[in-house]
A protein has these predicted regions:
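Glycine-rich, positively charged N-terminal anion/phosphate-binding segment
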Residues: 3-5, 27-36, 52-73
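Glycine-rich, proline-tolerant flexible connector loops at the mouths of alpha/beta enzymes
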Residues: 21, 42-63, 109-119, 170-183, ...
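Conserved, mostly hydrophobic/aromatic
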Residues: 17, 45, 96, 164, ...
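Active-site beta-loop-alpha junctions enriched in small/polar residues
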Residues: 18-21, 48-52, 78-84, 109-111, ...
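N-terminal amphipathic alpha-helix/helix-capping segment at the start of soluble metabolic enzymes
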Residues: 1-16, 23, 228, 283-286
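Active-site mouth loops of central-metabolism enzymes
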Residues: 13-29, 75-87, 140-156, 233-247
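Glycine-rich anion/phosphate-binding loops
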Residues: 29, 81-95, 118-122
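Active-site pocket-lining/capping segments in soluble small-molecule metabolic enzymes
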Residues: 119-144, 194-246, 251, 282-286
Length: 286
């Protein structure tokens, strides 16, 4: 089913994100995680690319196909373009179509300093525009409540986002954030800009201080004082930090849902226990 069609049905969409196992890990490890996550009956599951991935790597596509075939849950496959040629992309799009995976989250992808980027696609919008010429794919895009780290201003970032939507992105998923006010402010500005597609709030539970610090550095999200105190207090208490992180994410989600957000996209980090605990606390509100 087209992801964007899941919105506006009188409920808050709830979706999950997983990532493929590392190259030195068996692919079966993600299948075990999916066996638990699918019990939560999410509206869809997105599958990421690894850092520096290119369209010629079909691991993400295979996992997305596995989700749909074995669990009957729609999958949203991430597709990055910074390290891909149009020929790579054509091969992958044909592969996806043959697998019945028609929902794509179109991304530029992170630049790898060790790999010279290809020249065919410069921005996610150019990928969206290209895929729209290739058949009946349904396209989603990313958005940034605290603006993209390469954007000079919120105005510039919204201009790029509006162009991406105009090119064919039908649904947006936000980058992680830890202060809901940033999301609400961004949402208001996006709507005033004429961006009317559904916008999901991306939530990442804080369960590992080093991991969160790395993610914050990569995406530019800020850590509010309340969360900083949690990280400081429980830094060396693994289970306590996990439980506090779950509680913080639940509080965020409850506020977002009560405020009428289109959807919640949970970055699971392949941790079924944490995703399940959060779902248990919020599923009646959706």
């Amino acid at each position: 089913m087209q992801i964007s069609k899941k919105f506006g049905q009188g409920k808050t969409v709830f979706s999950l994100e997983v990532f493929p196992p590392k190259k030195d890990s068996p692919v079966e490890s993600i299948y075990r995680v999916l066996g638990e996550l699918t019990k939560l009956k999410p509206d869809f599951i997105s599958v990421t690319y690894g850092a520096g991935g290119n369209a010629a790597d079909h691991t993400t596509c295979d996992i997305a196909s596995y989700i749909q075939t074995n669990y009957g849950i729609d999958a949203l496959t991430h597709l990055t373009c910074v390290n891909s040629t149009k020929e790579d992309m054509d091969t992958t799009l044909e592969y996806l179509k043959n697998q019945g995976v028609m929902n794509i989250l179109a991304l530029r992808g992170d630049k790898n300093p060790e790999i010279e980027p290809k020249k065919d696609f410069t921005y996610a919008s150019s990928l969206v525009e290209y895929i729209k010429t290739k058949g009946d794919f349904h396209l989603s895009g990313a958005c940034y409540p605290e603006i993209h780290i390469e954007a000079s201003s919120i105005e510039e970032d919204l201009e790029h986002l509006k162009y991406k939507v105009d090119c064919g992105a039908e649904h947006l998923i936000s980058q992680l954030f830890f202060d809901n006010d940033y999301f609400f402010d961004f949402l208001e500005k996006a709507r005033k800009k004429g961006i009317t597609v559904p916008i999901e709030a991306g939530i990442m539970p804080v369960v590992n201080k080093r991991q969160i610090e790395r993610m914050v550095t990569m995406c530019g999200a800020s850590i509010p004082s309340k969360l900083a105190k949690i990280l400081q207090r429980y830094e060396h208490q693994e289970e306590a930090l996990r439980d506090a992180g779950i509680a913080y994410a639940v509080e965020q989600i409850m506020h977002l849902v009560a405020s009428g957000v289109d959807g919640i996209h949970l970055y699971t980090m392949n941790n079924a226990y944490i995703a399940t605990k959060i779902h248990e606390a919020i599923f009646r509100l959706l």
